[in-house]
Curated annotation (Swiss-Prot):
Catalytic activity: a quinone + NADH + 5 H(+)(in) = a quinol + NAD(+) + 4 H(+)(out)
Similarity-based family: Belongs to the complex I subunit 4L family.
Main location: membrane
Subunit text: NDH-1 is composed of 14 different subunits. Subunits NuoA, H, J, K, L, M, N constitute the membrane sector of the complex.
Organism for this UniProt entry: Geotalea daltonii (strain DSM 22248 / JCM 15807 / FRC-32) (Geobacter daltonii)
Name this polypeptide is given: NADH-quinone oxidoreductase subunit K 2
Keyword hit for Transmembrane: yes
UniProt membrane topology term: Multi-pass membrane protein
InterPro entries the record matches: NADH_UbQ_OxRdtase_chain4L/K (IPR001133), NUOK/Mnh_C1-like (IPR039428)
Length: 102
C-alpha cells in the first residue's frame, strides 16, 4: 500500500510546525531549541522522501542523506558548545549568554 503524497506532506507540515513551536516557546533552553530544529529538519527530510517516491526519483533520498550528515555534524558541535557553556556559566539558559563580554 502506497501512502498518498498529500498525507506525507500533511505529516511533514505538522512536524515542521511542532518543531517551530518547540523552538519558539522554549527559547530560553538551548537544548530544547536544538530539539526543535532537529524536528524541523526531519520534517523536511520526510517531505523530500515523499516527493521523490511520488515522482519515482532518488533525488529525495540522496538529499535526505545529505541532511542527515549535516544534522549529525550540527548536533555534535552544538552539544559540545552546550557542555562548554554549562561548565563556564553553570546554566543552559540562552538569555544568560546574550552579553559579548570577554
Amino acid at each position: 500500500m502506497i501512502v498518498p503524497l498529500l498525507h506525507i506532506l500533511i505529516l511533514a507540515g505538522i512536524l515542521f510546525v511542532l518543531g517551530l513551536v518547540c523552538t519558539m516557546v522554549w527559547r530560553m533552553n538551548i537544548i530544547m531549541m536544538l530539539i526543535g530544529i532537529e524536528i524541523m529538519l526531519n520534517a523536511a527530510m520526510l517531505a523530500f522522501v515523499g516527493a521523490a517516491n511520488r515522482w519515482g526519483t532518488a533525488d529525495g533520498q540522496v538529499f535526505s542523506l545529505m541532511i542527515m550528515a549535516m544534522t549529525s555534524a550540527e548536533v555534535s558541535l552544538a552539544l559540545a558548545l552546550v557542555v562548554y557553556l554549562h561548565r563556564w556559566r553553570k546554566t543552559v539558559n540562552a538569555d544568560d549568554f546574550n552579553s559579548m563580554k570577554g
